[in-house]
Structure formats: C-alpha cells, structure tokens
Amino acid sequence: WFDINDMDEFRVFTINNRDFPDPKRMNKYLHDNGFHSVYMIDPGVKVDDNYFVYKTGKEQNAFVCDIYRNEFHGKVWPGACAFPDFTRPETRTWWSGLYKDFMANGIDGIWNDMNEPSVFDGPGGTMPENNIHLGGGNLPIGSHLMYHNAYGRLMVEASYNGMMAANPGKRPFLLSRSNIIGGQRYAAMWTGDNEATYEHMKLSIPMSITL
C-alpha cells in the first residue's frame, strides 16, 4: 500500500522519483515475489500551473467553483488545491484519462482517499455548502450541500472507468473512503482512519452495517 509519500510533493498521479526512481521495476519485483501494489489517489489537485493535472483540468473548467463562480481552492496535503467537479461528464472523462499512464507503471490497484471531500481549512473539514457544481447529463447544477454525499461516488465511477480503459478485461481493485448506495459497483469501502477508542468503536457499528 503506497500512501501520499510515494507522490512528488503530494501531487496526485505522480511518483516521487527520488525515493522511487524506477517504479516499473519496483512493481515488477513486488509481482515476482507475490505482492500487489495499491496506490493512493486523492481528489485534491495542487494549484500549480506547471503541474499537468492542474493545468489540463483548469483548461477544461474541471474544478468546483465557489459561490462567486471562481475556482474554489482549499488546503489539503499539497497545500492549496482545486477539486474536480465530478458532476460534469467532461470532468469524469478527463479524470478517467489520467489513469492510463499512471497504471502503466505496473500498478495493480487504487485507493481513493480524502474524497468526502476532505478540506483542512473548510467548514466542518470539507468544502463550503454553497460551492457550485455545474452538473451535466442527467445531473442538474447544484450546491455542494446537494452533492456532498455523492462526491465520492462520482469520483470512484470516474476512477473505475479509467482503470478499465487502462487495463481492458482486468477487474479493477478500487477502494474508497467515501461512497453512497450504488457505488459498490465501482469500489469497495473502508471505514476511514479509526482510532482504538470506544467512541470510534461505537461509530464503526453503523458504518460497517452500511458498507
């Protein structure tokens, strides 16, 4: 399991070439020794015009807007981040396309984390309820309050389709921290980052029942 430290300065869809100079060779070594590799992909995209994910997303108007229709930025592991608007079919197609080159490194599975979405400096640890999702297809324009519970579900759909396109005929291994009913067709779930406390044990009961 490769967490955010395998990334280049926490940029999603990148690998830290200093510590992992040859990821294809490393993953082949793992395969030869009976292991599979699962890499993390979060929704937060570092705001950096020289970073290909942010640059291509910005060109396609792929990110969530604030109430004033400006691109919303919130802090996550890389610092200031933009967040894909997965209600837009064009955004889901763009996100799916990012998996092809990434999976070509010999990656076996993906875990989508922080996809409630988690925003460190946002109200309640997420983005403002009045942020705007533009929708498209059968999804109307709406506030984040309307789409919060669906955000992770729409993300894993895009991730699943990208993994299928990258490795046709191979069943994807995709794990998600956030999902809703129906999303299990795309990704399994886990119950988040739990601690060994009675409070978290109590919370784990309804969470496990609804997996």
Q: Where does each model-flagged region fall?
A:
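Catalytic-domain carbohydrate-binding cleft regions of carbohydrate-active enzymes
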Residues: W1-L211
